[in-house]
Amino acid sequence: SDHVDPSRLLEWCRVPADQLVGHPGLRVPFRMVEDAREMGRLMAQELVDLVAARNAEGRPTRVIVPCGPSGWYAPWTERVNARGVSLARLSVFHMDECLDWQGLPLPKEHPYNFRTFMERHFYGGIRPDLAVPEAQRFWLLPATMERVREAIAEAPVDLTLGGWGQD
């Protein structure tokens, strides 16, 4: 099954943290890290390594990314720029966005406008010659949801990075 039954979710919530690594019921790889800083470095490194490997194979990379946590953006941009990893074949599907009470996008300068935040912190620090093309940045809004769904369905997603709400 592709979803987690609510009763199974509650079972997972009862597993003590020190028993998660290597748990026999895991369906995805799991690692415990020391703190958010280490998680940010790990997220950045894994994504850069994936893009570089797929570039070397001549294959595009498709990822779903959250807006937060913000701790992985600096390591991401530093690694992409230092290694000269081209993001020309990277498609990025943004998993979230904040809307106003009417379901409309927040103003561009609103502190909770995720697109503005991502443009500044995820894309903004990347050298222009390495950048993700605008057409391969899929922003999730009510008006774009169907197009994003269709684009995701076109080919497998290579990596989905999860966020956590500490920011």
Regions found by a protein language model. Give the residues of each.
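Short glycine-rich phosphate-binding loop at a beta-alpha junction
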Residues: 60-66, 160-161
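Glycine-rich beta-strand-to-loop/alpha-helix junction loops that act as flexible
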Residues: 65-70, 164-166
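N-terminal glycine-/serine-/threonine-rich phosphate-binding loop
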Residues: 1-63, 81
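Ligand-binding beta-strand-loop-alpha-helix segment within the catalytic cores
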Residues: 4, 8-27, 85-163
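Generic structural signal for well-ordered alpha-helical scaffold segments
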Residues: 44-55, 77, 81, 119-123, ...
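Boundary/activation segment at the start of structured domains
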Residues: 31, 74-77, 91
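Glycine-rich loop at the start of a catalytic domain that most often binds anionic cofactors/ligands
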Residues: 70-85
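Short active-site-proximal "capping" loops at secondary-structure junctions
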Residues: 68-72, 98-99
